[in-house]
Amino acid sequence: MNHTKFQTSRIHRMLLPLTCTLLPAAAAQAAEAPGQKNAAGDRPNVLIIHCDQLGAWALGCYGGTQIETPNIDHLAAEGVVMTNFYANTPVSTPSRGCFLSGLYPNEHGAFKNDKQIRQDIPTFASELRDAGYTTGYFGKWHLDGNPKRPGWDIRGKDMGWSDRTSMYSFGHYKTIEAQPGTHPKFEKSVAASAENYPTDWFTDRAIAFIEEHKDERFCAMLSIPDPHGPYQVRPPYDTMYPPRQVELPATLTEEPRNDHFFYNETRNKIDRRSGKSEYDLILRNIRRDKSAYLGEIKCIDDNVGRIISYLKQAGLYDRTIIVFTADHGDMMGEHARMAKAVPLEASARIPFIVRYPKLIPAGSHSEHVASCIDFYPTILELTGTRQHGQVSGHSLARVLEGRSDRWDDAAFLRCYASVYPWVGIVTPEYKLIYGEKDPNGKALLIDRRKDPGELYNCFDDPAYSRVIRELTERIVRYCREHNDPHGEWLEKRIR
């Protein structure tokens, strides 16, 4: 498919009636337009909306209050929200590899940014394609290793995606060249319009793909490269949330009751003792970045509304499994940190929303702990697709459908990409993280029920000695079973 600038304008004109207003909750209840009979029969279509660096904390359906996200929240109200869903590694490449392959980072090969995913493993997309689905990917890929420059040229295998003409290798653009086959221009200035801003542009590509294949079984993955930095967004979103009105997190200046690396690494930078001018500058920068970050999310939400409107108009809304998620979050000032790569909630906990009324009860919430590796087997079971690949994740289908409450309730997290490698476990009650360079051998233990702000390190508290021992054994067992190299230094440490 040859996407030209002319075609981009035409698609926007075609979709203009769908973009004039937000999708209110009342409109979302409207009946679907009668569509043509789906030649694929009863098996559902699949649409995955996958964002980059979108923390669960920002969305209304996850308790966020700083922006309104009515369209994403509407998907949540009509489906199920996983409140404890985690990135196995809160960094782009390894997390995307986990989501695609159902394997841990050291198993799928892309264990840090700029590492290519193994080319010999199946993916949920290849399984669906083999089962008769037409598959298409639109947006940022970031699983192709370290090409010399960003662009539309993907070197590796298609990994199950038949249409990847609008898949680009890596990077974050604010203006997209509407001509795959050339290298898109990287513009940091906010000169983009709704016709060439990435969130809008890739949404157009996904809608066009679905329109072309609406009488087939399809799986479309819309990989939106926002709200990742550079924190800039097109008008009118760039002025919706003035920096002076942006709320700063309480943990930004509140002193943690511990001395762990994850807090102390940047704490001195935000300490008033460092000088008022520097302190004020840091706060201004955080407000500026968060202002744009919230605008980027609002733009995403509006585009989710466009997709919902199109699916309803095409008679596909109730015949499509819709998944909304992200690769990792963004600290955005929490604990005086920005970006990701740490196991704290703002970085590691991500949204995971699934809507499919035929199987999933509306308005459901699940507090079970799960992670990206669980998506592969889950989507195959939900679509009735036989699984051939060997994965480390487990299917959440019965949990999402409300048919079973049995679940292991643990997520294993690890990170190799940062200057501070770490590995750990999250359960409903606790989070235990070991870092290779922990000061004085002191790990991080959070009592999640008592301390949702993650301000207290309970590792030295004798009352938690049994918890620490049991969770440590589980981490060691995970490392052994999955050949995670973090286990080498961890076992030496705890001997």
Residues covered by each model-derived region:
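Residues forming the ATP-binding cleft of Hanks-type serine/threonine protein kinase domains
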Residues: 449
